[in-house]
Each structure stands twice: as C-alpha cells, then as structure tokens.
Amino acid sequence: MAGRRLNLRWALSVLCVLLMAETVSGTRGSSTGAHISPQFPASGVNQTPVVDCRKVCGLNVSDRCDFIRTNPDCHSDGGYLDYLEGIFCHFPPSLLPLAVTLYVSWLLYLFLILGVTAAKFFCPNLSAISTTLKLSHNVAGVTFLAFGNGAPDIFSALVAFSDPHTAGLALGALFGAGVLVTTVVAGGITILHPFMAASRPFFRDIVFYMVAVFLTFLMLFRGRVTLAWALGYLGLYVFYVVTVILCTWIYQRQRRGSLFCPMPVTPEILSDSEEDRVSSNTNSYDYGDEYRPLFFYQETTAQILVRALNPLDYMKWRRKSAYWKALKVFKLPVEFLLLLTVPVVDPDKDDQNWKRPLNCLHLVISPLVVVLTLQSGTYGVYEIGGLVPVWVVVVIAGTALASVTFFATSDSQPPRLHWLFAFLGFLTSALWINAAATEVVNILRSLGVVFRLSNTVLGLTLLAWGNSIGDAFSDFTLARQGYPRMAFSACFGGIIFNILVGVGLGCLLQISRSHTEVKLEPDGLLVWVLAGALGLSLVFSLVSVPLQCFQLSRVYGFCLLLFYLNFLVVALLTEFGVIHLKSM
C-alpha cells in the first residue's frame, strides 16, 4: 500500500505547470494598478521615476508614507495586502517593532499554511490523479512527486521571478535551499545514520545539479535570460527525467533473475523525502478511519457533513504530546478552511473519501475560491457586461451543479465521475499555495526594505529555511527509521527539479508576458558568494564521497555542517559590507 501511495501523488505536474503559468502571470499582470496611488510627488521628497525602496528609512518620518505610495519600486504587484504601506502609513514609528513582530508571525503562519496545503491536500490529489492516469512509477517519481514535494519552493520561485523587483529573492531562495539541503540535510542524514551511498544515482544527480548551477551562474554573469535559455532549463530537466528512467530500466534489467525481488520504486528515483510524504498522507486526513464509529448506523446528511469537516482526531489528541497539541491548535483553522474548500480523493479507500454533502458543497465553494484567488481576485470581481460579477455567476452555476449531484448520488456509493473531484481539489489547493507564496514573497520584500537587506540574503535565509524545514525533518525521520540512502537521494532529486523548473518556468512566464528577455540585476557580491558556495559544496561531495568509497561517515556529515556555518557567516558579512570588493 505504501509503495502504491508513494507513486500516486505525482500526476499532473504538466497540468500544474500550465496552471502555474496562468496563475502567476495573471497574479502579476492584473493588479499592477491596484497598488499605485495617485501620481503626485511626495512633499519634500526628490521624486524620481524609480528610487530604491530601501531608501525610505533614510527619509523624514513625515515623508515615508508618500514615498511608499508614489515610488514604483515600492509597489508589490499581486497579493492581497500592501505590507509596506501598512508599516509606513498605518503604524507610527514608535510601533515599528510591533509591526515587524506581527509580520514575522504572519510569515511563520504562512509557511505553516504552505506545508499543510501541500502535504495534506495538494499531494493527495496528485496521487489520485496519477492513479487515474495510470502513470508508471518512474515517470511519476521524477516529475509529479518532485513537484508535489517542492510545491512551496516552485510557487515561491514563480511568484518572485514574475516581478523584476523580487527576482533576487527567487535566486537566493533556490541557491540558499540548495546549499542548505546539500550540506545541513545531507550532513544530518549521515550523522544520524552512516551508510553506503549508491554510486550511480549519486554521480548522476550531482552532475546534473552541477550543470544546473553552472548554467545559472552563466545566466547571472550575462545578466539576462532569453527564451532559449528558459526553454533550455526545462529541456535539461526533461533530459534528466529520461536519464533517470533509462538508468532505472537498466538497473532493473541487471537485477532481473536475481534471487531478490526488486523494489517497486528503487532508491535511484526517489525525490525529496517521498517516503515521509507517504507516511504523512497515510496518517493525515484519513477521514473514514479516523472518525469511524464503534457501532454502524445510518448517518444523517448533517452528521456526515460535520464529521467530514472535523479536522481533529480526538483519540489521537489524547495520546499526543503537548508540543503536538500546541501545533495542532494553530493548524486547526487552516485545516478546517481547506477541508471546506478543497476536495480530496483517496483511491485506496473503499468509498474513495466520498462525502456527499461536503463534496456537493465543494462544487459551490471550490470554484468560488478559484475565481477569487486567480490573479489576486481580479477575475472574480470582474463584471460581465458591467452588471453581474463573475463570482455571482460561479456561485449560481455551482449551486445548480451541486443540487443535481446531491439528488443523483447516494451517501454510501461514490459516483462514477468522482475522480473529477481530484482535479478540482488539485486546482483549488494549487491556487491556495500560490496565494500564500505570493504573500510570503511580499512580506519578505517588506522586511528587506525595513532592515535594508537585499532580496538575495532574505531568499537564502528566511525563504530557504521556511520552504526546506519540512523536507529536512522528513529526511531526518527517514534516516532514523533506517532509510538513509533514500533520504540522501532525495536531497539531490528534489532540488534539481526546483532549480531547473523554478528558474526555467519562472523566466518563461516573465518572457511570455513582457515579450522581452528577463533582466537580472545581481545584488552585488552576495549572489556570487552564494553561487560559489553551492558549487563548492557540490565539488566537495563529488570528490570526498568517492574517496570514502561511498561509505558516508559522521565525519563527512560534520564537515558539511561546518561548511554551511562558514558559508552563512561569509554571506552575512558580505551583506553587511564587512567583506567587499572595491570593484563591486
């Protein structure tokens, strides 16, 4: 069952990519005017067409609000809240620490939203779609599961790349996550459980990742990304997928006839802590088993709805630790909202998680969420013929469809087209993730303005840590459970997808919208320090692992951790100008 669930959640990465293209391009394109205030120069401010927004803190307190509202560099295209205006126009200077504290708290909660949505709603629906499409393990493994696990990273990169002001944030996050995963996570795995690495998958993944990093280094050196380069990134990932499939096919042929049965999914093709995702999906939102009553009786429609919307397992609550309970309290509002708006299909259950009253309610609420989150709600409030908003039409159509479905189905038997709810759930959860990722990017940029930090350093620290912490714990759990090779392989498989698809698709969306090449303006020396550190960490592993005869010890793990600490110190010293070059 675990093997099946492991490979179920990956379908529709291509469809999701198309969704991302529409979602992100729309998010940036439609709301440009929404955040631009009247175009009058601020009193007492020497206004220029574009001034670095980080200079706002050097102005008089009375001029800061006007500067934020009139300076194009301070406008965040997309998102629902204007965080910079909130700090400088609605909080007095004496309450700036309070504003920053609230923003950081909201940022942490957004990371929680990203994790819950991806793990418990987005990935399970990908699993159901993969089962419906009958995809092979290999194809699903290196594409759709990688996308499902890396959804927060990919969405954050797409949102950041779609705005020239935050492109550095995307590069910092992708490079920063790469350094973090290949040093801290990989090192932690070997410290927890020394093991013998698989030579061929190791060489394959690290070489592909080094090529991706080198291409990104060249892209930064050129300072621009053309359509050919963007397509080249995506093409390289396709080539990687083909290589993995061929390597796995050759590996299985060599093992054919052996006394040992091959694994359904070999460690060679695992990506980004899959096994933990399986465990997560198996244990989370198993609605039927969690809330199954001791005595079977015919439940009413209201009882089915209440049980389906209950995100809390009371038996599990009683036996869990205080830490788990505290975290669950914060998750409950998010889980309830997602249960209400996102359908989840589970092919492994007899009823496929069919809950008639809730699923019929989804036919009304989910499309409404789609139109209100797509392009930051621009589509939803658009008035057809200047009379009726789109969201009203969606509610009417959804209500009619829900009524037909409710009276044409039963509580005990899922309908023949129930699998279509997986596509609806996938679309809705993807848009929830995109909305949260947009807010994350906007908050980080606002904090960068307040503290005069570059987008790159915010990306390599806060954004990289926030998006990678879940996978880090997942891989550490795998290592403790005796699967260090699987976890180590996941370190490289997932980040290859993130950098190639994140950069390639993000730049492709920007090019398709603006019809010009993407201009990149590296944040000084720091970007080169980041790229160099990632390259050095890969070279270190490429040289040291074969020298150890692929027997990875705790010494190797501690060396990787020491490397990351040194990198972090150098990066921060570079950001604050302690380390600098005269030519920079």
From Swiss-Prot:
Outcome following mutation: G494S: Lithium-selective; displays markedly reduced calcium:sodium antiporter activity while retaining almost normal calcium:lithium antiporter activity
PTM field: Phosphorylation at Ser-258 by PKA prevents calcium overload.
Regulation: Inhibited by the sodium/calcium exchanger inhibitor CGP-37157. Strongly inhibited by zinc.
Segments on the Extracellular side according to the record's topology features: 27-95, 162-168, 222-226, 347-360, 405-416, 467-487, 546-558
TM ranges: 96-116, 141-161, 169-189, 201-221, 227-247, 326-346, 361-381, 384-404, 417-437, 446-466, 488-508, 525-545, 559-579
Biological process per Gene Ontology, one example term: monoatomic ion transport
Annotated phenotype, changing D153A: Lithium-selective; displays markedly reduced calcium:sodium antiporter activity while retaining almost normal calcium:lithium antiporter activity
Listed Gene3D superfamilies: NCX, central ion-binding region (1.20.1420.30)
Molecular-function annotations in GO: calcium:monoatomic cation antiporter activity; calcium:sodium antiporter activity; calcium:sodium antiporter activity involved in regulation of cardiac muscle cell membrane potential; protein homodimerization activity
GO cellular component, one term: plasma membrane
Signal peptide start-end: 1-26
Pfam families listed in its UniProt record: Na_Ca_ex
Compartment(s): Mitochondrion inner membrane
UniProt keywords, alphabetically: Antiport, Calcium, Calcium transport, Glycoprotein, Ion transport, Lithium, Membrane, Mitochondrion, Mitochondrion inner membrane, Phosphoprotein, Sensory transduction, Signal, Sodium, Sodium transport, Transmembrane, Transmembrane helix, Transport
Known outcome of mutating P152A: Lithium-selective; displays markedly reduced calcium:sodium antiporter activity while retaining almost normal calcium:lithium antiporter activity
Residues linked to a glycan: N60
Tissue: Present in pancreatic beta-cells (at protein level).
Protein's job: Mitochondrial sodium/calcium antiporter that mediates sodium-dependent calcium efflux from mitochondrion, by mediating the exchange of 3 sodium ions per 1 calcium ion. Plays a central role in mitochondrial calcium homeostasis by mediating mitochondrial calcium extrusion: calcium efflux is essential for mitochondrial function and cell survival, notably in cardiomyocytes.
Family statement: Belongs to the Ca(2+):cation antiporter (CaCA) (TC 2.A.19) family. SLC24A subfamily.
UniProt protein name: Mitochondrial sodium/calcium exchanger protein
Organism: Homo sapiens
Lineage: Eukaryota, Metazoa, Chordata, Craniata, Vertebrata
Gene it is expressed from: SLC8B1
